UniProtKB/Swiss-Prot annotation:
It comes from Arabidopsis thaliana. This is a 2S seed storage protein. InterPro entries: Bifun_inhib/LTP/seed_sf, Bifunc_inhib/LTP/seed_store, Napin/2SS/CON. This is 2S seed storage protein 4. The lineage of its organism: Eukaryota, Viridiplantae, Streptophyta, Embryophyta, Tracheophyta. GO terms for molecular function: nutrient reservoir activity.
Length: 166
């Protein structure tokens, strides 16, 4: 009798464990399905950027950062000197608008869309000098940190190296 009772309890415990594992696996599979996209998250971000031209204020801010340093202003080296943006109300407002645009992006899309925005700035209008291209991409790289987007911080993309022709 004790053996039968033990077997029944063991069978019930096994059923309980299998049911629990099955439910857990279903939840994990559901989360994975929800997070994935048939075209992939990076391609989705690029497609959205191209369709809607996201981050217009960020592109304008990057353009201003590219020209910063001429005429005695601060330049972008390894860190940003934000004094000009704080003292100049127009630049401060533009940066705030850019940060607002970035906060509307999905965290997974922040860096890919910033890279697309930097690329758009780089190829708009005139041909830029290597130092200007570096400033564009450096501005894009650090924008999530400047805007205090904690899920992102600093974008991990490399700043393209442009050969100097002079």
């Amino acid at each position: 009798m004790a053996n039968k009772l033990f077997l029944v309890c063991a069978a019930l415990a096994l059923c309980f464990i299998l049911t629990n594992a099955s439910v857990y696996r279903t939840v994990v599979e559901f989360d994975e399905d929800d997070a994935s996209n048939p075209i992939g998250p990076i391609q989705k971000c690029q497609k959205e950027f191209q369709q809607d031209q996201h981050l217009r204020a960020c592109q304008r801010w990057m353009r201003k950062q590219m020209w910063q340093g001429r005429g005695g202003g601060p330049s972008l080296d390894d860190e940003f000197d934000m004094e000009d943006d704080i003292e100049n109300p127009q630049r401060r407002q533009l940066l705030q608008k850019c940060c607002s645009e970035l906060r509307q992006e999905e965290p997974v899309c922040v860096c890919p869309t910033l890279r697309q925005a930097a690329k758009a700035v780089r190829f708009q209008g005139q041909q830029h000098q290597p130092e200007q291209v570096r400033k564009i991409y450096q501005a894009a790289k650090y924008l999530p940190n400047i805007c205090k987007i904690q899920q992102v911080g600093v974008c991990p993309f490399q700043i393209p190296s442009i050969p100097s022709y002079y």
